[in-house]
Amino acid sequence: MTKEKKAGSGTRVLKTRVKKKRGLKSSSRRWLERHLNDPYVRRANSEGMRSRAAYKLIEIDDKHHILAPGMKVIDLGAAPGGWCQVAAASVKSDPAKPSVVGIDYLEMDPVPGAAVLQMDFLDDAAPDRLIEVLGGSPDVVLSDMAAPTTGHRRTDHLRTMQLCEAAADFAISVLKTGGNFLAKTFQGGTEGELLSLLKRNFRSVHHVKPPASRDESVELYILAKDFKGRQAAEG
């Protein structure tokens, strides 16, 4: 059912309420209500975006300018495709010769302007395959990867940090000089070594939390800009 809720401007916004159903836990019902009433979810549905996560990348790029026409981009953990959509539009990728390549072990529908690989990024063959399909080194490496949550905050943080570190190692090994790296992490206090690695290899490194990332979420993004080049990485 829906219920009218007054907005600050005097307009009315319909708020969706989920009826109580046998077998549906109250926590699941609250999550579903929040999801259905999320303005970013509604915006994604109306604008044809694959997920609300697309707006996280849009907001980060609007502020930090990491994507530009003509760039080549690799998107790690691409499913369901929201970031690929944003990247392809931002770099003006040609559907006939995509300059955006996404990879995920989950199946996802094709994204215009992006090539999609269904394979595990941690597969030994994945890095070479990504560069082969892209046709050269990327200007930007994106990673919205997160390990499946267990409900144990410390464990979830450590598992996602492992993915973030793997993404950072990959970015350092393939990026063009001057390139950018953006990756999801969780607040948890164990990312010191990763930050040190990135600061040695990029001229600017900091955390960002876009408005589309929920306030109660422990999710953060690490943004590393202006890659110093392979010589710095090997030094």
UniProtKB/Swiss-Prot annotation:
Disordered, as annotated region: 1-29
Q: Sorted alphabetically, which InterPro entries does this protein's record hold?
A: RNA_methyltr_RlmE, RNA_MeTrfase_FtsJ_dom, rRNA-MeTfrase_E, SAM-dependent_MTases_sf
Name one cellular component (GO) term.
Answer: cytoplasm
Subcellular location(s) per record? Cytoplasm
Per UniProt, the ranges with Basic residues bias are 14-28
Give any GO molecular function from the UniProt entry. rRNA (uridine-2'-O-)-methyltransferase activity
The main location is cytoplasm
Pfam families linked: FtsJ
Residues binding S-adenosyl-L-methionine are: 81, 83, 104, 120, 144
Highest taxon of the lineage? Bacteria
Entry's Gene3D superfamilies?
Vaccinia Virus protein VP39 (3.40.50.150)
Catalytic activity, as annotated? uridine(2552) in 23S rRNA + S-adenosyl-L-methionine = 2'-O-methyluridine(2552) in 23S rRNA + S-adenosyl-L-homocysteine + H(+)
Catalytic activity, EC? 2.1.1.166
What UniProt keywords apply to this chain's record, in alphabetical order? Cytoplasm, Methyltransferase, rRNA processing, S-adenosyl-L-methionine, Transferase
User: Which residues catalyse the reaction?
Assistant: 184
- Write out the function statement from the record: Specifically methylates the uridine in position 2552 of 23S rRNA at the 2'-O position of the ribose in the fully assembled 50S ribosomal subunit.
What the entry lists under PANTHER family is as follows: RIBOSOMAL RNA METHYLTRANSFERASE, RRNA METHYLTRANSFERASE 2, MITOCHONDRIAL
Homology family: Belongs to the class I-like SAM-binding methyltransferase superfamily. RNA methyltransferase RlmE family.
> What's the protein name?
Ribosomal RNA large subunit methyltransferase E
Q: Which organism does this record belong to?
A: Chelativorans sp. (strain BNC1)
Query: Corresponding gene?
Result: rlmE
